[in-house]
């Protein structure tokens, strides 16, 4: 709805007033002022006068008014030029006022043909030109743009020729104007055309021969090299002039030229060349706008203020932003190429410069100026504003150009094309004349550029975020795979440990069984030995030995009991290890379940990624649909413009009667101004509220994420600076427009006075004008009603946008609060997680230490078992030796008893025998026999004693136990033989030998007691160690329970952490979406305020 503006009404009324005044002067043949040189044509080819400059907006040509016109014309021209005309009329309508004009007048007005000529520097060969002609002639859209451009070019060239032709004054003035024309250097206006010939006539009455003669004259024209500097500098980019009236769609297309051309040229050339092309195009835009503003007020007293206003309107910041955005579009080449592919295919465009040719030959122009001096005096107030509007329209007609299409050069042949294009050209000129000039449209250009680049940035950020999410999901999938492999390796290691422990347990059980069997056998042997010892006779030595053996047996029994306890403890440890193995199996099962859950989560994430890709496709389709909608709206806008042109043609028939229409229009203008002020105040209030809310939200967000908000603060600062600049520009423009309105009101009052004077002298010829005034009033009423409905709809939309903004602010506040809460929870969960990890690592270290201790205990147990077996073997050997010694001692004891009994018997027998001998000897009286017998008996006794001693010694050394019997017999014989002293000595020696044996046995007993004490000490140490190990083993189940609890807590915390992390990620994504939405809403509000 950018074509709707309240100032249209005032400009339309003022233009209608000027046209009515002109037509009334013409009809009544009133000559109050001297004719000016606005519409007089200079002959082409006159010596000393250079031809007009081709294309562009020539400031010196605009300024010819001051040099060639009469002294009375400049104030009128300045008044006409400075007026902010939105839609002006240039062409003289031949359907109504031709009845009041003479044929010569009509002929002079109608002859203003314009012929295009190719430039002197072409950048494409003729073969490429022909191919591009064939390509560009096919699509219908290119024909629509071509016809629009042809119409614009006709209006521009026709009016420029009308302005640039001075009156036939003396030759010195002609030379001055010619010198001024030759010094003009302007950028060439370039048009899109798919035909080789652009030959346009503004009316249908000109014959074919006159058109061909004009084309023949224009063939000799050539452009100077300096006049094509901008064309050579930027051959592929049109120089779009700043049109104040161009709608939001058209300005969007103008700026899209820069973005799309920058992207396409980057794909074919370097980015540096692309940025230089964009800058040159922006420079052309700025210079063209300055030319337009400077040409619009050549004689205005406040020219410096007006230039400052234009500089503020099209500030360098806006152009630098556009340039930066075009450079940024290189990074997002894929996205912008998609957009350019959506918009550009099927359109064959070409660029042709316009050469402004003189309107008529010299003779015809001289005759027309002589006959129609009065008519041209009325025209001089209208020509300059019409030129201004036509230049605006020609700038507005710049549309996106496909850089891949070659530049098509127009050739000045085929005169029939001029007749075919002359009808649409006149209609387009009329449409262009009514195009308004609105300098604030420059701000719309900047706004649309920012909007488009924000769109591109959003698409780029969406693509980047999706690619990042995809990369994160792939990393998560790889991590899950690694965890699966790790879990499998742990399960395999646990299974190997299980097998190893089962083998160890089986070996320990076998050892325990063997020890139990040996213990039972030892008990049975002890019982048998006790029974045997109980049955036998008791002696002091055997009792001591038995006590010692019993003590040894008791010690060994105690050791066996301790070993059995240790074995029981080991069996308990084995059971606990089996339980631990079961727990490990449960952990493995849990890990497998967790791996399955992670696989399911990975599948879910893949599904989410697929859904996001589908959403991206939907976004692309929506973008294409929006592009098609934009094109459709552009077509609708063109259709509406055609309708407006038709309405304006109808309204031209009522141009003479403006008294009542002017009163109504002034009232409407005041009402619209009041409404505009109210709307601006409401917009300012909304913006203030939005700024306050945004400042609060920014303060909260700065506490959360200062880095993100710093960028937003910088953007808001830039926007505020731009807003201040725009406000300053608007204030300057408002002052300028107020001053201009005051001047226009003065002119209108003068015109009203003049019209009142004329209305009294108007004849019956003005009656049809009154009827047309009534028709104009009716059409004005319908237009006002339609504009009121439009205002209502706009106000409704404004209210809806305010409600949406409030809801969005609330959503952002809630999202920020949720994000804060989630961050606090995440920090607490992370701290708990770190503590649990530390505790888990500590418990794992304790578990490893306990495992090492358990291994050491097992090794010591095996070593002690080996020592116990050795002790058992020694015990068995000692038992066997003690049995043998016992048997020997018992046999010796019996032998000694028998010997003692024999000795008693022998001693008794010997005593009886000695008594009998004594009696016999006393009875026998022969002393010699007695001496002989005594000597013999002494000899025999000595021999017997010696033999007895020798035999006794030999028996002691050889046979041992048998010595007693031999000695006993010898003793008996010696006693019987009468050797008692020798026998006593022999017994003493045997007693000494027995005492030596006893001492030796006592030494052995003491050694055994020492070894027993050492073994008992070792047993005490082992029992203490075993008790300590038992206490540690008792602590193992507690540690296991604690480890299980910690594992459960760790798993639950991990699950909670995963859930919180997912929630935080979702909230982060929601917050990003809300921020993006707020950015878009802020940008929309700023655009509304700028508009």
UniProtKB/Swiss-Prot annotation:
Annotated GO CC locations: endoplasmic reticulum; Golgi apparatus; Golgi membrane; nucleus
Record's keyword annotation contains Nucleus: yes
Biased composition range(s): Acidic residues: 368-379
Coiled coil: 443-767, 824-894, 984-1090
Subcellular location: Cytoplasm; Nucleus; Golgi apparatus membrane
One function term, GO molecular function aspect: nuclear androgen receptor binding
Predominant place of localization: cytoplasm
Modification sites for Phosphoserine: 73, 78, 112, 136, 213, 324, 326, 329, 334, 340, 357, 411, 540, 923, 926, 931
Post-translational modification, as annotated: Phosphorylated by FER.
Keyword RNA-binding: no
Keywords: Coiled coil, Cytoplasm, DNA-binding, Golgi apparatus, Membrane, Nucleus, Phosphoprotein, Repressor, Transcription, Transcription regulation
Bias (Basic and acidic residues) ranges: 217-234
Biased composition (Polar residues): 57-81
InterPro entries recorded: Growth_transcription_reg, TMF_DNA-bd, TMF_TATA-bd
Biased composition, class Low complexity, residue ranges: 111-122, 131-142, 194-211, 242-253, 264-273
Domain of life of the organism encoding this protein: Eukaryota
Region described as Interaction with Elongin BC complex: spans on this chain: 329-338
Modified sites of kind Phosphothreonine: 927
Quaternary assembly: Component of the SNF/SWI transcription factor complexes. Interacts with RAB6A. Interacts with TCEB1. Interacts with STAT3 and FER. Interacts with TRNP1; may regulate TRNP1 proteasomal degradation.
Domain description: The Elongin BC complex binding domain is also known as BC-box with the consensus [APST]-L-x(3)-C-x(3)-[AILV].
Protein's name in the database: TATA element modulatory factor
Species annotation: Mus musculus (Mouse)
Underlying gene: Tmf1
């Amino acid at each position: 709805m950018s074509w709707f503006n309240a100032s249209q009404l005032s400009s339309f009324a003022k233009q209608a007033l000027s046209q009515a005044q002109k037509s009334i002067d013409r009809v009544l043949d009133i000559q109050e002022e001297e004719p000016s040189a606005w519409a007089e044509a200079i002959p082409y080819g006159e010596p000393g006068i250079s031809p007009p400059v081709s294309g562009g907006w020539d400031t010196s040509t605009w300024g010819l008014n001051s040099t060639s016109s009469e002294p009375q014309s400049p104030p009128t021209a300045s008044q006409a030029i400075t007026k902010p005309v939105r839609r002006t009329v240039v062409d003289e309508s031949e359907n109504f006022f031709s009845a009041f004009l003479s044929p010569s007048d009509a002929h002079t007005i109608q002859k203003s043909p314009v012929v295009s000529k190719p430039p002197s520097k072409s950048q494409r060969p003729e073969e490429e030109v022909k191919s591009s002609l064939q390509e560009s002639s096919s699509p219908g859209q290119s024909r629509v743009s071509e016809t629009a451009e042809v119409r614009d070019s006709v209006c521009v060239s026709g009016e420029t020729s009308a302005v640039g032709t001075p009156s036939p004054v003396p030759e010195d003035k002609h030379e001055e104007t010619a010198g001024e024309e030759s010094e003009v250097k302007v950028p060439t206006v370039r048009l899109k055309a798919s035909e080789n010939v652009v030959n346009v006539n503004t009316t249908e009455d000109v014959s074919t021969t006159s058109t061909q003669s004009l084309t023949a004259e224009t063939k000799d024209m050539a452009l100077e090299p300096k006049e094509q500097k901008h064309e050579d500098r930027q051959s592929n980019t049109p120089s779009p002039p700043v049109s104040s009236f161009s709608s939001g769609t058209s300005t969007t297309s103008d700026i899209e030229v820069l973005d799309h051309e920058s992207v396409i040229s980057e794909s074919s050339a370097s980015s540096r060349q692309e940025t230089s092309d964009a800058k040159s195009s922006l420079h052309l835009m700025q210079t063209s706008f300055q030319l337009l503003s400077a040409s619009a007020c050549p004689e205005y007293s406040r020219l410096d203020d007006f230039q400052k206003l234009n500089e503020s309107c099209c500030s360098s910041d806006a152009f630098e932003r556009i340039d930066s955005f075009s450079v940024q579009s290189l990074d997002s080449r894929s996205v912008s190429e998609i957009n350019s592919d959506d918009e550009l295919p099927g359109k064959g465009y070409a660029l042709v410069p316009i050469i402004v040719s003189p309107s008529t030959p010299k003779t015809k122009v001289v005759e027309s100026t002589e006959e129609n001096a009065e008519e041209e005096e009325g025209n001089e107030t209208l020509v300059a504003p019409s030129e201004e509007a036509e230049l605006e329209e020609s700038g507005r007609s710049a549309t996106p150009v496909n850089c891949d299409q070659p530049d098509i050069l127009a050739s000045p042949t085929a005169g029939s094309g001029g007749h075919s294009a002359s009808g649409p050209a006149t209609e387009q000129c009329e449409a262009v004349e009514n195009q308004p000039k609105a300098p604030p449209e420059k701000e719309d250009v900047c706004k649309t550029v920012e909007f488009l680049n924000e769109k591109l940035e959003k698409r780029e950020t969406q693509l980047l975020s999706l690619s990042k999410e995809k990369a994160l999901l792939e990393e998560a999938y790889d991590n899950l795979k690694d965890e699966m492999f790790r879990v499998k390796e742990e399960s395999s290691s646990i299974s190997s440990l299980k097998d190893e422990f089962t083998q160890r347990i089986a070996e320990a059980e076998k050892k325990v069984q063997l020890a139990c069997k040996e213990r039972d056998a030892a008990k049975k042997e002890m019982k048998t030995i006790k029974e045997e010892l109980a049955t036998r006779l008791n002696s002091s030595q055997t009792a001591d030995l038995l006590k010692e053996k019993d003590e040894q047996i008791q010690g060994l029994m105690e050791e066996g009991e301790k070993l059995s306890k240790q074995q029981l403890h080991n069996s308990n440890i084995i059971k606990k290890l089996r339980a631990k193995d079961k727990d490990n199996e449960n952990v493995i099962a849990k890990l497998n379940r967790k791996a399955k859950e992670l696989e399911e989560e990975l599948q879910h994430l893949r599904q989410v990624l697929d859904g996001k890709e589908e959403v991206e496709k939907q976004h692309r389709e929506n973008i294409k649909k929006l592009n098609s909608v934009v094109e459709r709206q552009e077509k609708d806008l063109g259709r509406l413009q055609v309708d407006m042109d038709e309405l304006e043609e109808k309204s031209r028939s009522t141009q003479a009667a403006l008294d009542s229409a002017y009163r109504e229009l002034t009232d409407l203008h005041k009402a619209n101004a009041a409404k505009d002020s109210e709307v601006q105040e409401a917009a300012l209030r909304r913006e203030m509220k939005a700024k306050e809310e945004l400042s609060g939200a920014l303060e909260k967000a700065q506490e959360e994420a200062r880095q993100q908000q710093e960028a937003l603060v910088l953007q808001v600062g830039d926007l505020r600076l731009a807003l201040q600049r725009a406000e300053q520009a608007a204030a300057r423009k408002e002052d300028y427009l107020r001053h201009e309105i005051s001047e226009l009101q003065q002119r209108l009052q003068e015109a009203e006075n003049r019209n009142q004077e004329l209305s009294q002298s108007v004849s019956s010829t003005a009656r049809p004008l009154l009827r047309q005034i009534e028709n104009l009033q009716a059409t004005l009423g319908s237009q006002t009603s339609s504009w009121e409905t439009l205002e209502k709809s706009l106000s409704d939309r404004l209210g809806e946008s305010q409600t949406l903004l409030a809801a969005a602010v609330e959503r952002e506040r809630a999202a920020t609060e949720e994000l804060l809460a989630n961050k606090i929870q995440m920090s607490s969960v992370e701290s708990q997680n770190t503590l649990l990890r530390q505790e888990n690592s500590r418990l794992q270290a304790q578990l490893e230490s306990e495992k090492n201790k358990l291994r050491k205990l097992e090794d010591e147990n095996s070593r002690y078992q080996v020592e116990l077996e050795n002790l058992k073997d020694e015990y068995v050997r000692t038992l066997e030796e003690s049995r043998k010694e016992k048997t020997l001692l018992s046999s010796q004891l019996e032998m000694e008893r028998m010997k003692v009994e024999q000795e008693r018997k022998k001693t008794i027998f010997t005593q009886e025998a000695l008594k009998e001998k004594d009696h016999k000897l006393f009875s026998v009286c022969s002393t010699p026999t007695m001496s002989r017998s005594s000597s013999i008996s002494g000899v025999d006794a000595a021999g017997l004693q010696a033999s007895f001693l020798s035999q006794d010694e030999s028996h002691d050394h050889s046979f041992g136990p048998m010595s007693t019997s031999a000695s006993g017999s010898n003793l008996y014989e010696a006693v019987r033989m009468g050797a008692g002293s020798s026998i006593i000595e022999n017994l003493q020696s045997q007693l000494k030998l027995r005492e030596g044996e006893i001492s030796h046995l006592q030494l052995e007993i003491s050694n055994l007691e020492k070894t027993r004490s050492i073994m008992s000490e070792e047993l005490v140490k082992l029992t203490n160690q075993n008790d300590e190990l038992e206490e540690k083993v008792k602590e193992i189940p507690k540690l296991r329970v604690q480890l299980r609890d910690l594992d459960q807590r760790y798993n639950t915390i991990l699950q909670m952490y995963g859930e919180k992390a997912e929630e935080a990620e979702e909230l982060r994504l929601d917050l990003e979406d809300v921020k993006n939405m707020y950015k878009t809403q802020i940008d929309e509000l700023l655009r509304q305020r700028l508009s």
